[in-house]
């Protein structure tokens, strides 16, 4: 089913006019879907630190290329297909979909290889600077971050940036599956391949870290240590599999020393923050044959130190997007787990905001007063 007669839609979006300044709710034009594109009516969008670094001005959008601001941020979304362009065969209006920063064309060498989810057809940076689908009312191009820009009532994107999911899933909460849930869970179960009886440590218990804990639990790790300076994370960490909570501020000794003394190091060290001191700490907390997993979105200039000698004892460092899981499979699996009650996604949504409250929503992320905050569209 195609919609050749579809036209541009005027709707509201949170437009970032300059990094570091509050977003403004503006009327924008979302273009009709062209060939191999779909237009989606958004139901909800999650708030992720990757977008926050740009919104807060810690990184300039123009550094990624393209025009920079004005821009519409957001990549973690759920919605209903409103219309489709020519050549689209997988989607019809009414389909429930999740949006993804990790597109899959399904045909390139990488998409056909089971070991990676990095599609060669789509460059992440170029996707981030897309200006083809959103306009101001006077015709000025707007950057749609990650080729999506889901802080908008409607989006137009490629058919490879959206993925059909179980219609029984509550889309108001399912948006967080597309990034924080999927990234954390599959970083443990797929990328790291946590094994039964292992010892795992997770630094940073935000939206991704909590789901990493659950992935470790799902794969039957024995010791699952959650590390965070926010004591308020202790309760929910335990609910999602944490067997021991460490607050570095009150521990009384360096975390790496404690982990070495008590466990002989950890089999898996997950960095869910992306800051150098934590990366350094995780790197020297590994047991023999241990694996360090980099999940946090570190700035390009961030480097960490690990003695080269340590690698002689089969220690290794890995990283990936969405836990290196194929996006289509990941979203369908997780939505099915959500629907059947295996995965308590609802518990992870700690704060809900309207689009008009989006700046307030980002403040909860900055203050650490949330597991995952979402914007719900009415």
UniProtKB/Swiss-Prot annotation:
What subunit structure does UniProt give?
Monomer.
Q: Gene for this protein?
A: gedh
Q: Does the keyword Chloroplast apply?
A: no
Top class in the EC scheme: oxidoreductase
Name the protein family.
Belongs to the zinc-containing alcohol dehydrogenase family.
The residues the record assigns to binding Zn(2+) 2 are 105, 108, 111, 119
Tell me the Gene Ontology biological-process terms attached to this UniProt entry: formaldehyde catabolic process
Q: Which cofactor does it need?
A: Zn(2+)
Q: Which organism does this sequence originate in?
A: Carpoglyphus lactis
Q: What EC number(s) are associated with this protein in UniProt?
A: 1.1.1.347, 1.1.1.354
Job of this protein: Catalyzes the NAD(+)-dependent oxidation of geraniol to geranial, playing an important role in the biosynthesis of neral, an alarm pheromone. Cannot use NADP(+). Also acts as a farnesol dehydrogenase by catalyzing the oxidation of (2E,6E)-farnesol to (2E,6E)-farnesal, with lower activity compared to geraniol dehydrogenase activity.
Please report the name of this protein according to its UniProt entry: Geraniol dehydrogenase
For this UniProt record, the keywords arranged alphabetically read as follows:
Metal-binding, NAD, Oxidoreductase, Zinc
Pfam families given in the database record: ADH_N (PF08240), ADH_zinc_N (PF00107)
Q: How activity varies with pH?
A: Optimum pH is 9.0.
């Amino acid at each position: 089913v195609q919609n050749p007669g579809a036209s541009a839609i005027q709707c509201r979006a949170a437009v970032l006019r300059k990094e570091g300044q509050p977003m403004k709710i503006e009327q924008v034009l979302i273009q009709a879907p062209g060939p191999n594109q779909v237009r989606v009516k958004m139901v909800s969008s999650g708030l992720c630190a990757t977008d926050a670094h740009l919104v807060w001005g810690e990184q300039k959008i123009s550094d990624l290329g393209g025009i920079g601001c004005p821009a519409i941020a957001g990549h973690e979304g759920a919605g209903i297909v409103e219309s489709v362009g020519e050549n689209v065969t997988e989607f019809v209006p009414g389909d429930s979909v999740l949006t993804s920063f990790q597109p899959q064309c399904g045909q390139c060498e990488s998409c056909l290889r089971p070991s990676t989810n990095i599609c060669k057809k789509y460059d992440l940076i170029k996707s981030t600077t897309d200006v083809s689908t959103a306009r101001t009312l006077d015709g000025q191009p707007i950057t749609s971050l990650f080729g999506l820009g889901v802080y908008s009532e409607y989006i137009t994107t490629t058919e490879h940036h959206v993925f059909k999911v179980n219609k029984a899933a509550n889309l108001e909460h399912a948006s967080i599956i597309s990034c924080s849930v999927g990234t954390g869970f599959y970083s443990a179960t797929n990328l790291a391949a946590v094994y039964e009886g292992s010892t795992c440590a997770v630094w940073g218990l935000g939206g991704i870290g909590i789901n990493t804990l659950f992935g470790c639990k799902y794969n039957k790790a024995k010791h699952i240590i959650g590390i965070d300076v926010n004591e308020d994370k202790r309760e929910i960490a335990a609910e999602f599999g944490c067997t021991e909570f460490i607050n570095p501020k009150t521990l009384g000794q360096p975390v790496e020393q404690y982990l070495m003394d008590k466990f002989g190091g950890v089999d898996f060290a997950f960095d869910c923050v992306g800051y150098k001191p934590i990366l350094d700490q995780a790197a020297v907390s590994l047991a023999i044959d241990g694996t360090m997993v980099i999940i946090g979105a570190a700035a390009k200039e961030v480097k960490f130190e690990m003695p080269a000698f340590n690698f002689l004892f089969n220690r290794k460092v890995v990283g990936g997007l969405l836990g290196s899981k194929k996006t289509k499979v990941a979203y369908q699996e997780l939505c099915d787990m959500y629907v059947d009650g295996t995965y308590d996604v609802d518990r992870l949504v700690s704060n809900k905001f309207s689009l008009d409250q989006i700046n307030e929503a980002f403040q909860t992320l900055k203050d650490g007063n949330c597991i995952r905050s979402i914007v719900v569209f009415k």
